[in-house]
């Protein structure tokens, strides 16, 4: 991809877990549309999303999202990113409806009609007044996906979105991703071990298994 057309540019990214290197001088350009990050369980997919979300600090390298360089303006960078780790316990005590109601203040391009559509499509209305700790794995991911798609964030990061989903929800998810991927100013980065049917993947980033 021509760097001039990339929404996200990553240069020389380096990161290690204690005693275990994960990325060494890794570079990539991500444009508008859907990008698949694929690899096995130990390939660093989730770690990469956390690095792109500025949740983990790299030991070297730079990230530029639009005109914003993470190292120069970390808060401005993070305001352009949607990332919610489905495995994190940090949201357990929150009520779904209250969490969703707080998101428009964080995302300037928040799309309320889109959220309403996704709440219907994922059949989430019975769960809006529950705490996140009460949600099944699949329902939790559906809530996060509805918010991610409605966020309007230039960089939207999603980790293993189909875990725990039934077939109808997977079909809806794939159609919603395909529709959202048409936006000319959004990069949807999805980490999964294989491509999802019906999603027009603009690019595929394959991560090797870590030794």
Question: For each predicted feature, which ranges?
Answer:
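Hydrophobic anchor residue at the start of the ABC signature
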Residues: 145
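Walker B catalytic motif
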Residues: 160-161
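Q-loop/switch helix immediately C-terminal to the Walker
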Residues: 87-109, 114
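Helix-to-loop junction immediately C-terminal to a conserved catalytic motif
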Residues: 53
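A short, flexible loop at the N-terminus of ABC-type nucleotide-binding domains that lies
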Residues: 1-32
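Conserved ABC ATPase "signature" region
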Residues: 112-128
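Conserved ABC transporter NBD signature motif
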Residues: 58-72, 76-77
